[in-house]
């Protein structure tokens, strides 16, 4: 049953291990082994008020190693001192990194763990939001983000890496990052520096319930964030980590996290956590899913989506690429500007002070740019006026009526969405910039997708709804036109509504996944009529459903929370 294309690990928290009996572990492990091929366990030495005694940990370590399961250490950087009275609040009891007592405790925990394990992962609580008097004094005139980025870089080096290596020079230290990339800089997570300090990184791919939980993450984030970390230092991100929290409403949502983690080419998957998954309904379903995903990995190579430029320490339009990723546009999130045929820039990208020069050179080379209204707004008054006559105003429009493409003066198609959408009003100079899609309200219309030329290149401006999830409420015809712009240089695009995602790979293979709760049909348009559409899992060619003047069209049926692997061949 061993997986050929990824490894599987389970994380075991300190509070559980501290009280675990070997007989109980034996029984629980038998349940897991019925369904999963576990190659590693992360054994946590410390979390909060719990630290596993050395002798107890050695016995647990020996237990798993006798089962041919590799053991690595884990640390959660939260702490509770029994006699400590604080007059300030620390979220999740994270350490105060200007408090010397806390720093010495962290050093002690790290050295204890390094004496036991050659590999250690830090769970994603290695951050600070502390605003105690000591931190306020240390911050001085710096912003909180600048202060915390500097602080956690120093703590990483001086209180994690150096102490660990002093005890065990062979120890490899992994930092696991949470799924809230937009907030890293505000809490001291600094991948730009920490990727050089730590031996490896690890990605949190938990998305759970996007609407009813604290983090409200689009499910596509399970894919995009892992790709961003892979693009920091290719090969240095060890894997993706997800859990079953808030997933009981829909087992499919749990399995989607597994799908996207594997689609993003994770080398290892970590399940959180042993005590929560033992005897869980999630485990048998996941076991079957991982076997199927392992087979899929034989047919996909490297991800090849449209680059989305998300610089280090940036925010602006949080997860906008994930919302759009849920509408059938394949993305590749990266901290580095890419000179590909098309690049997507958002308000996040505006944090690069040289972004305008990069865009101009990109366009002069005959390539395309798609920018959001948020990026346009952030760059107004900073030179973006050289590229377009479109401007963001402070006015809004509420409508569900849209028009597509211009024929002479009127539009070629008029369509209604499912509900009214609130959008910022953009203005432009007629015939200086061109309308591709507009929103109509009363006797007026407003840009949704605009087109400009600069040198040999083309720049598109996409209006972003005030509520990003309202992209899901745009008419299917509007979403299809937006896809066609993004996928101008691809051999295919889909005609469909919302909550359909596409993942593209370098070997002409792609995956279409449905996030809908009901069965749906997608029309897949192949631009090159000489190409055949293959199902590599079944080793068969699909039949053409419809033929247009320039395209072959295939009807692809998708069940809820399902996907299809397809390949184009000559």
Language-model segment annotations:
Residues 1-2, 33, 58-72, 157-171, ...:
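Surface-exposed amphipathic alpha-helices with a cationic face
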Residues 5-27, 55-66, 70-116, 129-132, ...:
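Active-site-adjacent "subsite" loops/lids of carbohydrate-active enzymes
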Residues 11, 44, 84, 90, ...:
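Hydrophobic targeting/anchoring helices
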Residues 17-35, 100-113, 183-194, 222, ...:
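Short, acidic/polar
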Residues 22-30, 321-340, 347-350:
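A short, well-structured beta->alpha microelement
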Residues 35-47, 93, 102-146:
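Active-site groove signature of glycoside hydrolases
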Residues 44-57, 214:
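Glycine-rich, proline-tolerant flexible connector loops at the mouths of alpha/beta enzymes
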Residues 331, 335, 347-569:
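A conserved amphipathic helix/loop scaffold
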């Amino acid at each position: 049953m061993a997986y050929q294309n990824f490894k599987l690990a389970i994380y075991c928290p300190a509070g559980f291990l501290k009280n675990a009996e070997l007989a109980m572990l034996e029984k629980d492990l038998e349940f897991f082994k019925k369904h999963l091929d576990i190659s590693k366990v992360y054994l946590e030495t410390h979390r909060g008020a719990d630290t596993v005694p050395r002798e107890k940990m050695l016995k647990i370590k020996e237990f798993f190693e006798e089962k041919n399961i590799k053991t690595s250490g884990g640390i959660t950087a939260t702490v509770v001192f029994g006699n400590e009275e604080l007059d300030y609040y620390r979220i999740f009891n994270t350490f105060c990194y200007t408090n010397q007592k806390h720093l010495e405790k962290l050093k002690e925990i790290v050295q204890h763990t390094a004496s036991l394990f050659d590999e250690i992962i830090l769970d994603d609580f290695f951050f600070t939001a502390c605003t105690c008097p000591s931190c306020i004094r240390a911050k001085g005139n710096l912003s909180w983000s600048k202060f915390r980025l500097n602080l956690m870089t120093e703590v990483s080096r001086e209180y994690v890496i150096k102490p660990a290596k002093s005890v065990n020079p062979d120890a490899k230290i992994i930092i696991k990052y949470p799924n809230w990339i937009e907030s890293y800089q505000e809490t001291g997570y600094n991948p730009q520096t920490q990727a050089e300090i730590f031996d490896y990184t690890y990605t949190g791919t938990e998305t759970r319930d996007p609407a009813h939980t604290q983090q409200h993450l689009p499910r596509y984030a399970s894919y995009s964030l892992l790709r961003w970390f892979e693009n920091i230092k290719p090969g240095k991100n060890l894997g993706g980590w997800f859990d079953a929290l808030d997933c009981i409403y829909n087992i499919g949502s749990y399995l989607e996290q597994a799908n996207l983690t594997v689609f993003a080419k994770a080398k290892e998957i970590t399940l959180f956590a042993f005590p929560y998954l033992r005897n869980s309904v999630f485990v048998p379903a996941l076991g079957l899913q991982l076997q199927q995903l392992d087979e899929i990995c034989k047919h996909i190579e490297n991800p090849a989506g449209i680059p989305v430029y998300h610089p280090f320490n940036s925010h602006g339009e949080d997860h906008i690429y994930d919302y759009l990723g849920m509408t059938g546009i394949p993305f590749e999130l990266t901290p580095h500007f890419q000179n590909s045929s098309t690049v997507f820039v958002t308000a996040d990208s505006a944090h690069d002070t040289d972004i305008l020069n990069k865009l101009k050179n990109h366009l002069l080379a005959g390539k395309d740019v798609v920018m959001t209204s948020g990026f346009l707004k952030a760059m107004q008054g900073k030179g973006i006026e050289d590229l377009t006559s479109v401007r963001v105003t402070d006015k809004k429009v509420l409508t569900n009526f849209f028009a597509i493409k211009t024929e002479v003066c009127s539009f070629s198609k008029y369509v209604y969405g499912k509900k009214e959408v609130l959008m910022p009003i953009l203005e432009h100079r007629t015939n200086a910039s061109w309308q591709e899609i507009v929103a109509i309200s009363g006797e007026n219309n407003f840009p949704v997708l605009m087109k400009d030329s600069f040198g040999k290149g083309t720049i598109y401006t996409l209006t972003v709804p005030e509520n990003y999830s309202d992209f899901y409420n745009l008419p299917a015809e509007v979403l299809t036109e937006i896809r066609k712009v993004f996928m101008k240089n691809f051999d295919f695009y889909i005609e469909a509504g919302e909550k359909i995602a596409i993942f593209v790979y370098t070997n002409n293979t792609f995956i279409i996944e449905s996030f809908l709760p009901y069965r749906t049909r997608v029309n897949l348009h192949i631009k090159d009529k000489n190409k055949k559409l293959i199902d590599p899992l079944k080793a068969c060619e699909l039949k053409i459903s419809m033929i247009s003047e320039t395209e072959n069209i295939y009807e692809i049926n998708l069940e809820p929370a399902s996907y299809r692997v397809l390949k184009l061949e000559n």
